[in-house]
From Swiss-Prot:
Keyword Transcription: yes
Record's keyword terms, sorted: Repressor, Stress response, Transcription, Transcription regulation
DNA damage is among the record's keywords: no
Name of the protein in its database record: Heat-inducible transcription repressor HrcA
Amino acid sequence: MISSRQKLILKAIIDMYSEKGEPVGSKALMALPYLNYSSATLRYDMAVLEELGFLEKMHTSSGRVPSERGYRYYIEHLVTRDNDVTEVFPLIDEVFSKKALGREHTIKEALKLLTDLTSYTAVAVGPDILQSHIKRIEMVPLGLKDAVMLIVTDTGHVQHQQIHISDDMRMDDIKEVIHTLDDLLKNRTLEDALKVLKEEYAISELNQFMSYQSQIIDSFIEAFSKFASDSFYLSGMTNAFEQPEFNDVSHMKRFIDMMDRREIVKLIGTAEGISVRFGSDMEIKPLNQMTIISIPYQIDSKQKGTIALVGPSRMSYQKVIPLLEYIAANLAKLYKDNNKET
């Protein structure tokens, strides 16, 4: 489709535009040792790339900037990994070496480091919580009048819900209800578990504990609702507002609302390998000139999560991609190690 020389020119323009944020002209390209061609040759190839839709011409400048199509081609065929990025890998290793502080803490610290290194907004989405399977449900007494119900999933999620035991309730009966729930719901997905609790046979199993049934089921549902918040992590949201793409206050407000409602989760790719979504893909005004680049991390044959960056389309992909890949690999290991321990 395009010649080898035109590929070099396209890559050079995108790399230079990512670094400086200014349109690139033939004079700047001629300064590169591997593009030692005449100005006329470079201008001709730039015009061809523009005609093919890989470049756009700015009205205020004779230089060109990449189009979305140009970025797509670059990411799919031309991008190289910046070897200098490996210099910060020890910082990432240090974050994940402190996993004893808890998975949630480690993920938050990893995202914070990622936003510090890139100045973009970072998002991590854990395994699809609705498809996690219940590994066990158990009760831990806390004195005479309180207990904690623990729900553990096969993906390493642990959620707890405190239960207060009133005077008309017995600890042994509470244990029996939770034991019955464990028998009913073990090895089911969380999504299925909610459906099972509404089915007749589940209700009949619990009817013998009528005075406790409602409270325990309510506690289970409350614990379930907490799982969703545990699988979504966000860092550096205000970094987006430093970008000129967010000069419009209404776009800024919509972006905040979108993050609060977690609409971003629907936009993050779940396919294998690198997924890139540009503004035109998303039809959301705050993201018109933004890009979401995401990479999945595989936990096992069924479970995977995703880590993503939200930034301007002109972000430095050759630096961002290896960072995302390295953190994704560490996240996969973190989940796997956690699963072995639960």
